[in-house]
A protein has these predicted regions:
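N-terminal acidic leader/helix
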Residues: 1-29
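Short, charged early-sequence alpha-helical segments and their helix-coil boundaries
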Residues: 46-68
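Amphipathic, non-membrane alpha-helical rod segments
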Residues: 30-49
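Short intrinsically disordered terminal tails
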Residues: 1, 68-71
Length: 71
């Protein structure tokens, strides 16, 4: 599978971040519902990209950043 990294970084990541912000406002950033959504959606997107290492590492960075924000 050839991956369009430009599309991934310019569309997929920003769209996911926007949905993440919306979800955190809906259910609360610290809620189990939010974190389940985070893990589920990250997993789904990574699978769409056949768990490509750059994709999974990027989402790993985002997940770690979110955890730090949560305190």
């Amino acid at each position: 599978m050839r991956i369009d990294y430009i599309d991934f970084f310019s569309r997929v990541i920003p769209e996911w971040m926007a949905r993440s912000n919306q979800k955190s406002q809906e259910v609360g950033f610290g809620s189990d519902t939010y974190w389940l959504w985070v893990v589920t959606t990250i997993g789904e997107i990574c699978k769409q990209y056949n768990d490509d290492s750059l994709v999974t590492e990027q989402f790993g960075l985002l997940f770690n950043w979110l955890e730090k924000q949560a305190g």
